[in-house]
Amino acid sequence: MLAGIAFSSSALAQDGEKKDKDYLVLHGSIQSDILMPEVDNKIGTGTYKDDILTNTYAELTLASKHFEVGGRFEFLEHPLPGFENDFKGWGVPHIYAKYNSGKGVEVTLGDVYDQFGSGLIFRTYEERSLGIDNAIRGGRVNISALKGVRFKALGGVQRRYWDWDTDSWVAGTDLEIDINQYSQKMRDNNVSWTIGGSYVLLNYEKNDQVVIPGTNYELNLPSNVNAFDVRSSLTVGNYNILAEYAWRSQDPSFDNGYIYRRGSAVLLSASYSSKGVSALVQAKRSENMSFRSNRSITGISGFINNMPAFAYQHTYSLPALYPYATQAAPGEWAFQGEFGYNFKRHTALGGKYGTKMKLNISHIRGLDKSPVEPVNGTLMGTDGYETCFFKTGELYYQDINVQMEKKLSKSFKLNLMYMNQKYNKTVIEGEGGMVKSNIAVAEGKYQINKKFTLRSELQYLWTNEDQGDWAFGLVELSALPYLMFTLSDMWNTGETNQHYYMGSVTATYKAHRLMLGYGRTRAGYNCSGGVCRYVPASKGVNISYNYTF
């Protein structure tokens, strides 16, 4: 049936290739991830009620020169392991209609994704690997009719899985101005300066009843929560400086222990980039910035904002074993620096083909807090704590890694990485203390001929904490243009001595991609952008199909 849909949709798309002449164009995608699970008590999979688990999505968009309508069907009735209970369901939860005048005015009705600035006070988005879809159902207006000026206004109710919480609604506006558009001198000197400001209102039509334990005192929860954001981005030649400040009014919630302290965030970023050299330095201080459309829920759903992650996003398996989750409610001081340099060809360190080096440092600490006087033994209903702006608390996370990319011959390329990591498992996961580890990675890629490429990875993690040492190996053979064969094993050489083996075959043909695999997956956290989802251990047949047209 899916193949039939794909064929007919592709045919319709070919009928309208020239959108500029107001033809109708149909495009979309299908994504289906399937697990046929097996019980494996050695790795703690637990038992399953269903023989087949799947997360399946199908999107369709019909567009012309000025109009666009779209929707997404989701079948999550028997979801993959590790998603929250309310994630289960099926239907068409995402629909929209959009009008674009072609003269700087765009109007959208339905479900909206958007972001103000860096997302400190507003970001709605979809991230399927985490099970996040926090779209606003309502409307949005974008206006860019004036030179260098972009304005947007939106409002509606927020999606939380298969529920749209009508007990609250969200509205917001955002304005950005490119100052350089009004200065010929700035443009002549390659200077770009953008300033922006945002406002978000969260209104509760109905408030929860929260009583301080041991008393009859019910908290007077605010019906309106206001948030503001101002920012400035200046680019001069190869240099860029970004500064952003966000503030949120009182919002007692489950996340912050129902305290009345206001939230704030400051973000500073400076970068430089030229041929062969790049540098980035960032700092962020956030405090009590968990911001949801429902103040009593937990987990990863219902967020109106998203605090940017200041930890390096690793793609290798063992460096990603202990990923950092942004601590939005407690707050954090986060620092990140990155320096990259390309040694030129035919130099002592560059060799025949050149060498790429990169150093990344992430250092994240808590805030130094002094609790206020409790009421009946609890901080509920109080400001919670006092803090000094520049003082830091305990270490949450640290990652120092060095990476090298080196082409040794026309057919062989070598990547090396060393990483030193400190991971406060008690803060990030709830228990476990500080995990200190050292990780080494070697990746080789050998092009056998124009059709076949062999890639391999060897990784090792040393630690005296948690489950001890880990080893990882991978071999991958690509047979262009259609097939890829992969074998891997993650082995806990420390505490459990368990192997997490996996074998897969991936086939690609035009816009189709099909992966068939079998093996084990270890329990752990899947993270993206500082948001993490716990994924339990699993074993079985994995099937993944993707098609885009």
Language-model regions: role of each:
Residues 132-219, 223-228, 233:
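Hydrophobic, small-residue-rich alpha-helical packing segments that form membrane-like cores
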Residues 34-53, 378, 383-389:
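Surface-exposed strand-loop-strand hairpins of Gram-negative outer-membrane beta-barrel proteins
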Residues 61-158, 185-187, 275-296, 467, ...:
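Outer membrane beta-barrel
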Residues 31, 186-190, 221-549:
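Exposed, low-structure sequence patches enriched in small/polar residues
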Residues 19-46, 362-364:
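Short glycine/proline- and aromatic-enriched beta-strand/turn motifs that initiate or cap beta-hairpins
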Residues 14-26, 62-66, 99-108, 146-149, ...:
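Short loop/turn motifs that connect adjacent beta-strands in outer-membrane beta-barrel proteins
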Residues 76, 80-87, 161-164, 248-261:
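Outer-membrane beta-barrel proteins
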Residues 1-25, 549:
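Bacterial Sec-dependent N-terminal signal peptides
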